[in-house]
Structure formats: C-alpha cells, structure tokens
C-alpha cells in the first residue's frame, strides 16, 4: 500500500526526530545539522536518573514510593513514574530525563497499540525502565511500533475521528492525522528537553 500523500511529510519529520534523539542518547555520533559528525557518549544510569533541582519527579522503584509532591508511581514492574491524579500540581514539578523519556516511550507504545494493536493497553501496563540502556532500547522499540502503526493508515483512516483509541488524551475527538501531527510535536519538544538535560548534566558541578 502506498503512503497517503498527507502522511509523507509527517512520517519524514518523525523519522528525522526519532533518529536524532536516538543518536543523542546512544551515540557514538550525532549529525551536527550540517553533516559534520559530533561525538556523543552513551547515556549513563547516573545521568538518566539525575535530579538537577530539589523536588524532581522521576522514575523510581515502587518499593521506595513516590517522590516529593507525587502520590503514586504509575507503571508495571519494579519501577514506576511519579504522578498524581488529575489535576496535576501547579506549577508543574521539574521532571528528570528518566521521567521525560519514560513518558515519551509510553505515549508512543500505547498509541501504537490503540491504533493497530489490541487497543487495550493502559499506563498501568507500561513498564518504566530503571536504567539508561533499557530506557533507550524501550524508546526505540516504541518508536518502531508507532511507525509500523502509521504505515497501516490510508486516506480514509487519516480523516477518521477517534481512529486511535488512546485513553489519556483527546484522541477520541480528533481525526487521526491530527494525532499523527501531535505525536510528532511530543517527540520534537521532549527530544529537545532531553538533549538540553544532557548538556546541563555535562556542564553542571555535581561534586
């Protein structure tokens, strides 16, 4: 099946942003933007869980309980992500690289399932990663699943309201092409945040 013309630029943008974030996390190099490779060291566990300010929300062991201001650790397995029931605190707590990458991975994986899978997964089924290597691998797998789901879409699907049944957003009220656009925005802005946190970690005095 050929790609719907409207999907082509969105898929191209997704592929670019996904590759750029993966390279920024795993290395060994990253395209500087003009074709020049820049050396990148792999994300470490210490960096993954680094809390640059007091009161961060992060990914934590369920056995340790939620962090400051959070009331629950959401997710299956040994680790969960800090959160509260809606409405969330104002101002929003600062979130760690681990929190942001976990959130991004979850939204990709769950939306893939609610587009071309069982349409049943929830946040309680998602397993947050407690170490950097597992988190990067989980992100890559979730991005691959979302991309595969996009390849099932035709022009009719793109215009279908509620085609993606993801339960934690406005997907039920939106045509699918708007969900595809929104996921790209999530990837772009969280990817930029994650890249900045890597820079801050590199240059911050921590000892």
Spell out what each predicted region is.
Residues 1-125, 164-207:
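Short, contiguous alpha-helical
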Residues 127-160, 177-188:
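Acidic/histidine-rich alpha-helical segments that form the ligand environment
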């Amino acid at each position: 099946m050929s790609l719907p013309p409207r999907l082509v630029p969105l898929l191209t943008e997704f592929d670019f942003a996904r590759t750029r974030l993966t390279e920024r996390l795993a290395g060994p190099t990253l395209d500087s933007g003009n074709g020049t490779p820049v050396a990148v060291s792999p994300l470490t566990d210490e960096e993954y869980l680094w809390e640059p300010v007091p009161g961060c929300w992060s990914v934590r062991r369920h056995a340790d309980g939620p962090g400051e201001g959070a009331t629950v650790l959401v997710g299956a397995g040994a680790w969960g992500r800090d959160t509260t029931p809606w409405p969330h605190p104002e101002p929003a707590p600062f979130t760690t690289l681990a929190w942001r990458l976990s959130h991004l991975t979850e939204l990709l994986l769950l939306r893939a399932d609610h587009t071309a899978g069982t349409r049943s997964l929830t946040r309680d089924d998602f397993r947050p990663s407690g170490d950097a290597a597992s988190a990067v691998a989980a992100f890559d797998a979730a991005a691959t699943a979302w991309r595969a789901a996009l390849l099932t879409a035709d022009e009719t699907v793109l215009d279908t309201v509620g085609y993606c049944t993801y339960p934690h957003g406005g997907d039920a009220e939106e045509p699918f092409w708007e969900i595809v656009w929104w996921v790209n925005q999530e990837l772009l802005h969280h990817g930029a945040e994650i890249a900045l946190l890597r820079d801050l970690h590199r240059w911050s005095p921590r000892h």
